[in-house]
Amino acid sequence: QPTQGAIYTPANPRPDSPELTPGDLKIASFNVLNYFTTIDMGTGHWVCGPSGDMECRGADTPEELTRQRAKILAALSEIDADIFGIMEIENDKPLGVGESPDYAVADLVAGLNAEFGAGTFAYIPTGAIGTDAIKQAIIYKPAAVTPVGDFKLLTTAVDSRFIDTLNRPVLAQVF
């Protein structure tokens, strides 16, 4: 237990408010709350996650998935951002016949493009990220921004202070 108060010396003072400059990009983060295109079959069905050894999350029936997808697409459409940082989307599992990497985020992009027109939205193809059943994703409008270089991940391999077993890898992309 400390016996006296801490001595604080400000070394990096912050402005009272940020200096805003004119811009024309709309960037948003959106938590899709366990959006899985793989139906959750309940306890004991270990088919999700990058190793196919985790229970799925999200919709328990095809009808529930349809409802969840419609709500997410309605919200994303209303926000209409140029770049979306997506949280809690299904991480790639071992792929079956006819499946392609990033299938959950690809499904949302297909839904957005069905409303706004082919090619209006795209996503950063990452494949599986980390070991959890969920990951992050990035959806963007190619007419507004262009990815520069490859995406990057913050993991223990990049910085030993980032503990993979306690944190999901962080996804970043320069546009």
Language-model segments: what does each one mean?
Residues Q1-F175:
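Divalent cation-coordinating acidic motifs and surrounding scaffolds
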